Regions:
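ATP-dependent adenylation/nucleotidyltransferase module used to activate substrates
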Residues: 2-172
Length: 172
């Protein structure tokens, strides 16, 4: 019997790839997904996640973390008056003196993984997939995609004693 897996599903290419890999490895019947709304301007993300889950026939749970990010000045969030930049990460980092890009939502992945761990444990899942990758960590654009952030995996293991995280950039 295959272990159960939870996939953090945003509807983007990275999380959709994680979903397909989880289904391939664990079987469709052993995969569930969590989609998180956090007040992002692009509500099409949630619509895409629903469409992807429907396509694969996967059970989806949704969670609204909008209040948690109400104080962030991140340009991705709907309450921000700032435009989402079109420049490359390298250009943005140069303009900001090496500070994270304006689309960085503080500790978003940390909160997402913590929420996913809680839901996953309740659903008896022992693996969590999410689509962070090295490009997002380049130059400290998104600190919660960095190698240092991998420590979050160890915290999840300690807290749950049975849940491990599988990251797209680390899949073998």
């Amino acid at each position: 019997m295959s272990e159960k897996a939870m996939v953090l599903c945003s509807g983007g290419v990275d999380s959709t790839t994680c979903l397909a890999l989880a289904i391939e490895k664990h079987g469709k019947e052993n995969v569930c997904a969590l989609s998180i709304y956090y007040g992002q301007k692009h509500v099409k993300e949630i619509q895409a996640a629903k469409a992807v889950l429907e396509y694969y026939g996967i059970e989806g749970t949704s969670l609204d973390l909008t209040p948690v990010f109400a104080y962030s000045d991140c340009s991705l969030l709907s309450h921000s008056t700032e435009d989402i930049p079109e420049e490359s990460y390298a250009e943005q980092l140069a303009q900001r003196g090496g500070k994270p890009v304006t689309t960085y939502v503080p500790f978003r992945n940390g909160l997402f993984l913590s929420a996913a761990a809680s839901v996953a444990l309740s659903k008896n899942c022992s693996v969590i997939y999410y689509g962070a990758h090295h490009d997002d960590a380049a130059g400290n654009a998104y600190p919660d995609c960095s190698e240092e952030f991998e420590l979050q995996r160890d915290l999840l293991r300690c807290a749950s004693r049975r849940c491990r995280r599988q990251c797209l950039s680390r899949l073998q």
